[in-house]
């Protein structure tokens, strides 16, 4: 009896965990009316297309079964014709694919170049701003150096004038 109760508790616990997992997967709100209408419209359409593809497959199999004797009788003519048509189709498809690849690569290069030229004024403006800042900084440093030299010259001139008058001998 205790085993049955324990098994029941285990089952309830597992069921609760599964329920929480499912709740985590499912969306919290119901689909909107437009989503429901879309599903209601596309589901039958998808089924119809699936049925039509099955019918096309069945018709192809029946047609192949009926046409096989004709293919065997006319095979000396049909095989070279089929090879010729197959090679022509392969050539056209290859040409189109290579042309599309070339066109897309040229488009990519043109877009890359266009983006590079659009960014160039930003780089030029940034370089111009840095040059102006460097010139202003150099001018400021030059002015400071000029003032320092002027101050030293004034000190030397004042010190030399006062010291020169006291240190020189006059003969009279």
UniProtKB/Swiss-Prot annotation:
Keyword Transmembrane helix attached: yes
Primary location: other
Pfam families in the record: Oleosin (PF01277)
Location in the cell: Lipid droplet; Membrane
One GO term (biological process): seed oilbody biogenesis
Residues covered by region (Disordered): 147-172
UniProt entry keywords in alphabetical sequence: Acetylation, Lipid droplet, Membrane, Repeat, Transmembrane, Transmembrane helix
Tagged with keyword Mitochondrion: no
InterPro entries xrefs: Oleosin
Region (Hydrophobic): 39-110
Function field: May have a structural role to stabilize the lipid body during desiccation of the seed by preventing coalescence of the oil. Probably interacts with both lipid and phospholipid moieties of lipid bodies. May also provide recognition signals for specific lipase anchorage in lipolysis during seedling growth.
GO cellular component: a single term: membrane
Biased composition (Gly residues): 158-172
Modified positions (N-acetylalanine) in chain numbering: 2
Gene: OLE18
Transmembrane segments: 42-62, 70-90, 91-111
Name the UniProt record assigns to this protein: Oleosin 18 kDa
Region named Polar: 2-38
Membrane topology annotation: Multi-pass membrane protein
Top-level taxon of origin: Eukaryota
Family: Belongs to the oleosin family.
């Amino acid at each position: 009896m205790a085993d049955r109760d324990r098994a029941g508790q285990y089952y309830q616990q597992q069921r609760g965990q599964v329920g929480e997992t499912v709740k985590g997967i499912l969306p919290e709100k119901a689909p909107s009316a437009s989503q429901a209408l879309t599903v209601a419209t596309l589901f039958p359409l998808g089924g119809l297309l699936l049925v039509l593809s099955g019918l096309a497959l069945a018709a192809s199999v029946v047609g192949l079964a009926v046409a096989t004797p004709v293919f065997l009788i006319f095979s000396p003519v049909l095989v070279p014709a089929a090879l010729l048509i197959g090679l022509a189709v392969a050539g056209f498809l290859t040409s189109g694919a290579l042309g599309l690849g070339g066109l897309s690569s040229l488009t990519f290069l043109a877009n890359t170049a266009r983006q590079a030229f659009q960014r160039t004024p930003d780089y030029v403006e940034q370089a111009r701003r840095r040059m102006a800042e460097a010139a202003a900084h150099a001018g400021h440093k030059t002015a400071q150096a000029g003032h320092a030299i002027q101050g030293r010259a004034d000190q030397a001139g004042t010190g030399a004038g006062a010291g020169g008058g006291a240190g020189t001998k006059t003969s009279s």
